[in-house]
Regions:
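Bacterial N-terminal signal peptides that target proteins for export
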Residues: 1-7
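N-terminal signal peptide c-region/cleavage motif recognized by signal peptidases
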Residues: 14-16
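N-terminal small/polar-rich segments of proteins
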Residues: 19-88, 112-155
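Extended, solvent-exposed segments with strong compositional bias
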Residues: 92-120
Length: 155
């Protein structure tokens, strides 16, 4: 009886991680209408953010339409109007953590259970836009507009 030992090699491939998915829905245009420069102007809307990570974590980054992503509204020749952006990972709030252009705010958690927010909580976060009273007082009468881009990333 002859016994031979053959080397045994096994190639074990790690299973690919499930694709990390995040989604934001429920965003609408924010219209301030005619404003009086007596106090700050604040508008909030509740949105839905979904994250499929086990802890449902995400980070949010905001970019405005001003130079370098600044949060400004433009009125063409009438100038610009600065605004602030706040975020909360809870819905129905009119204040949150201040965001800076291009800087991610991490540590956010979603309660959404469905990627399209069609079932479970339909609103999970608050977006707040604030125009400071001093900026309103210094602004010329005009129609101002701008674009805010939000990026949601898994965390």
């Amino acid at each position: 009886v002859v016994a031979r030992a053959w080397p045994l090699a096994a190639l074990l491939a790690a299973s690919p991680l499930a694709a990390q998915e995040v989604n934001i829905s429920g965003l609408t245009d924010i219209n301030f209408g005619a404003l009086r420069p007596v106090s700050e102007a604040r508008r909030a809307q509740s949105v839905c953010v979904f994250s499929n990570l086990p802890a449902r974590g995400y980070m949010v980054t905001a970019q405005g339409s001003g130079a370098g992503g600044a949060f400004v509204l433009d009125a063409g020749g009438a100038g610009e109007l600065r605004y602030g952006v706040e975020w909360s990972d809870r819905p129905d709030l009119d204040s949150g953590m201040p965001l800076q252009p291009g800087q991610a705010l991490g540590g956010q958690t979603s309660t959404a259970t469905d990627a399209t927010c069609g079932s479970g909580p339909v609103r999970t976060a608050s977006l707040v836009i604030v125009i400071p009273a001093a900026d309103l007082a210094a602004a010329r009468a005009a129609a101002f507009s701008g674009t805010l881009t939000l990026t949601i990333a898994p965390q």
